[in-house]
Design a protein with these regions (language model features):
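Well-ordered, non-membrane alpha-helical segments in soluble/globular domains
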Residues: 13-16, 71-80, 225-239, 258
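A generic structural signal for short coil/turn motifs at secondary-structure boundaries
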Residues: 220-224
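Catalytic donor nucleotide-activated moiety binding site of glycosyltransferases and closely related
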Residues: 240-258
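Active-site and donor-binding regions of nucleotide-sugar-utilizing enzymes
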Residues: 5-151, 155
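A nucleotide-sugar donor-handling region in carbohydrate enzymes
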Residues: 131-218
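Extreme N-terminal starter segment of soluble prokaryotic enzymes
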Residues: 1-3
Length: 258
């Protein structure tokens, strides 16, 4: 029995594809954050379409107090959420390891495998670490202490990543090349269609002249001012996208056509 964890849409896709490639015939459980009900209303289709055998919602946030108190409460929440002993899984694969759940696993000497947070992120751990250091310094301190930003914990046994997108001098003996989109395209067409449906991704046939703009929350994450973020998109439209049909994917996952 295999346990997957995902926090974002991209990470859910990583888990779906990995399961289809490596563990298609095994019983696979998926843990998502409770907030997924708003971000991904069709998340239950992950189970009904048999992309995973069972899906459970775990409260990743809202823990306060000392390190010992947080670890204890996370363990209690996990036992309420998951009808299995966490140690009964053959493998645990976590996408988005900067959480108190991974602190709990490491404190209990429970090994797990990880996925990078985005293409090329494994060799650039400072990006996410700096965002969290500014936005949640208390949480950052504890998670950094457990080696979850730079992935140095020896209990992380494998690190799935896009090797082509890493820094030129990147080396890690635990890194495993995992090209998410290439592997996705290798899946049967029926499976690809079902996955797109879960994410509400439209068919783009006949849109050869269209541009898909993938947006980021730079301002909300403290990486840019709101004015700076607006300036980026204004320059894109003024100098590169004028007269083009643009499909904008906001962080919410919707795809309006402008």
């Amino acid at each position: 029995m295999i346990l997957y964890q995902a926090l974002s849409s991209y990470q859910i896709l990583e888990c779906i594809v990995h399961r289809q490639v490596y563990h298609r015939e095994e019983k696979c459980i998926l843990i998502l954050g409770t907030y997924i009900t708003e971000r991904m209303p069709r998340y239950r289709e992950l189970e009904t379409k048999k992309l995973f055998d069972e899906v459970y919602l775990f409260r990743f946030g809202g823990y306060r107090g000392s390190e010992e108190k947080i670890i204890r409460e996370v363990g209690e929440e996990l036992r309420k959420t998951l009808p299995y002993d966490i140690r009964s899984f053959e493998k645990i694969l976590a996408a988005g390891i900067h959480t108190y759940l991974q602190v709990y696993l490491i404190s209990g000497k429970i090994p797990f495998e990880m996925f990078e947070d985005g293409s090329g992120a494994l060799s650039r751990p400072w990006i996410l670490a700096e965002i969290h250091r500014k936005s949640a310094p208390g949480r950052y301190s504890l998670i950094e202490q457990y080696g979850l930003y730079d992935h140095r914990s020896p209990l992380i046994t494998k690190k799935y990543c896009d090797m082509r997108s890493q820094e030129p001098d990147f080396e890690d003996e635990r890194a495993v090349d995992f090209q998410v989109m290439e592997r996705f395209r290798e899946l049967p067409e029926r499976m690809q269609k079902e996955v797109r449906g879960v994410f509400d991704v439209p068919e783009l046939e006949g849109e050869a002249d269209a541009v898909l703009l993938l947006t980021q929350q730079f301002a909300n994450l403290g990486q840019l001012s709101l004015e700076g973020q607006i300036s980026i998109y204004r320059h894109l439209f003024d100098y590169y996208l004028r007269g083009r049909k643009v499909l904008i994917k906001p962080p919410s996952g919707r795809y309006p056509v402008l």
